[in-house]
Amino acid sequence: MKIEGTVVAMVTPFTEDDVVDEAGLRENINYLIENGVDGLLVAGTTGESATITHEEQRRMIDILVDEVNGRVRTVAGAGSNSSREAMGLVEYAEDAGADAALVITPYYNKPQPHGLIEHYTMLEEAADIPLIIYNVPSRTGTDIDVDTVAELAKLDGIIGIKEASPDLDKVSMLRSRLMDLGLDDFTVLSGNDNLTLPMISMGAEGVISVVANVDPARMSRLVNEALSGDFESAMKTHYELYSLMKVLFIESNPVPVKEALNMMGKARGSCEDAPGTPAGCKP
């Protein structure tokens, strides 16, 4: 199983009554597929995984798998700072038929490397669904190091990492270590739209993208150009998207991307339980 190319970190649309807009979610799924993306993720950071209920999370996984119907890869957000909760979500994603589960490093508790290895090993042993590690130290307070990732990459069920730290040298160190271990099949995905081009040049194989919610065709083009080795064209596409990459993060994600989708007439709704965040998020 490979998860690569442009995977969209989808927003969670809500109705005016602050319930998940299931019809809107299906509309967004089809819009993104029609514009050439390679995969879709629900209930990630952009999907407000930290504030939606587990019931909402499970329902979105069901809708994703049903609506996609094999057309692109499906990735279920299934992380938690509780190993038991994460296990339940991973098992649910497997039963629902998702292609992979994205599992964030446990947040707030700030586990040491041995704790991270224990956490992910337990999840890998609990279910047969491929797992993708999600490293986003700016949100979790934990930055999983290269040695720990390399150790986890030896497990058959852990197939890749979404790397959302800004440290580009870390990508080189990780790729070098994986090559030394003969683990070339382990996938590295960019977790930052603006760093996707340089990360692919260092051996990453795609991106889990926020920007692709708004401009899926052009973000897919950037990734495809870079993966094919056409870095001159990819650089031009990168700079065509650069202003969008920056403006979508002028407020806490997903506030700007939801407002952009609102301006486009796409389903977005308010943000769930996001105090102090304007531009369409409820207080």
UniProtKB/Swiss-Prot annotation:
Keyword Lyase: yes
InterPro entries per the UniProt record, alphabetical: Aldolase_TIM (IPR013785), DapA (IPR005263), DapA-like (IPR002220), Schiff_base-form_aldolases_AS (IPR020625), Schiff_base-form_aldolases_CS (IPR020624)
PROSITE patterns attached to this UniProt entry: DHDPS_1, DHDPS_2
UniProt cross-references to SMART domains, sorted A to Z: DHDPS
Statement: the UniProt record of this protein carries the keyword Cytoplasm: yes
GO MF term list: 2-dehydro-3-deoxy-phosphogluconate aldolase activity; 4-hydroxy-tetrahydrodipicolinate synthase activity
GO terms for cellular component: cytoplasm
Pfam families: DHDPS (PF00701)
Top-level taxon in the UniProt lineage: Archaea
Active site: Y134 (proton donor/acceptor), K162 (schiff-base intermediate with substrate)
Alphabetic keyword roster: Amino-acid biosynthesis, Cytoplasm, Diaminopimelate biosynthesis, Lyase, Lysine biosynthesis, Schiff base
EC numbers: 4.3.3.7
Location in the cell: Cytoplasm
CDD domains xrefs: DHDPS
Reaction it catalyzes: L-aspartate 4-semialdehyde + pyruvate = (2S,4S)-4-hydroxy-2,3,4,5-tetrahydrodipicolinate + H2O + H(+)
Major location category of this protein: cytoplasm
SUPFAM superfamilies: Aldolase
Record's subunit section: Homotetramer; dimer of dimers.
Function (record text): Catalyzes the condensation of (S)-aspartate-beta-semialdehyde [(S)-ASA] and pyruvate to 4-hydroxy-tetrahydrodipicolinate (HTPA).
Protein known as: 4-hydroxy-tetrahydrodipicolinate synthase
Origin species: Methanothermobacter thermautotrophicus (strain ATCC 29096 / DSM 1053 / JCM 10044 / NBRC 100330 / Delta H)
